[in-house]
Amino acid sequence: AASDVYKRQPLLLLHGYPETHLMWHKTAPALSKYFTVVVADLRGYGNSLVLPGGKNHINYSKREMAKDMVQLMDKLNFKKFFVAGHDRGGRVAHRMARDFRKKILALSVLDICPTLDMYENTSEQFARAYFHWFFLIQPAPLPERMIMSDPKKWIKNCLNKWSGNHKFGNVEEAYLKSFKQKKRLHASCEDYRASATIDLEHDNKDRNKKLNIPIQILWGKRGVIGKQFNSIKIWQKYSNKKVYGTEINSGHFIPEQNPIQVIFQLKKFFLKQ
């Protein structure tokens, strides 16, 4: 019954690149037994609103994308909630926790370190593994035209390289659908351009402002984050509370590659808050 659903704490799930809210298809049903689960497409992705990038790519800043999600939760009458974000969704969730401190009860981020730290600690090894961070931020329309020449190849390359050749099944077509649309492809590039410009400005201003909420980090054993960053140590710099971290036997796309562990870890973390 609807009344029973609203007795459970709300949990917002946010996806990453190059995916949509469908990346949670293996985890959301099980999590909905314990939480009121909300899954949403980030601005510009999937079936969400597409806006022009604006000056300094501000319309795709994580601040604006975080506002979208808070407005969505307000519309659903959720004044306070848990949030878990993978990849780009993790960056939006991090900004949300900073800008809307009274709304976020606890935060889980999957397979990322803070944007500021990743750029400041860029090495040759990181640049080779995450070349898209430097490709997608190039001025429009260079990356857009190159990807649009063969969007299927681009999506397959991203999914295969970052997962270690995981089989995504039919959901891969849904991810590809977005990248066949010029406006959405452009929006996804604007997301990255914002991260290298306006987002860094916001992050630098907040560098010394610590969060006061429980934070969990999950990273893939075979992913770049686990190999190149001390995730717990880095995230702990941003929090007054103990940061909990767990390595998952997975590549980058943890919710699809190891859904059982993701369900277990999210449930364990959020239910104890």
Where are these regions (language model features)?
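Short, small-residue-biased leader/transition segments that mark boundaries at the very start
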Residues: 1-6
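Flexible "cap/lid" subdomain of the alpha/beta-hydrolase fold that forms the substrate-access gate
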Residues: 7-10, 23, 38, 45-84, ...
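Active-site glycine-rich loops that stabilize anionic/oxyanionic intermediates
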Residues: 8, 16-19
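Structural cue for short, hydrophobic secondary-structure segments
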Residues: 13-16, 39
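A short, glycine- and basic residue-enriched loop/turn
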Residues: 20-21, 251
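Short amphipathic alpha-helix adjacent to the substrate-entry channel of hydrolases
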Residues: 22-38
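Hydrophobic residues on the short alpha-helix immediately C-terminal to a glycine-rich phosphate/catalytic loop
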Residues: 27, 96, 265-269
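Catalytic active-site module of serine/aspartate enzymes centered on a nucleophile-bearing elbow/loop
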Residues: 242-273
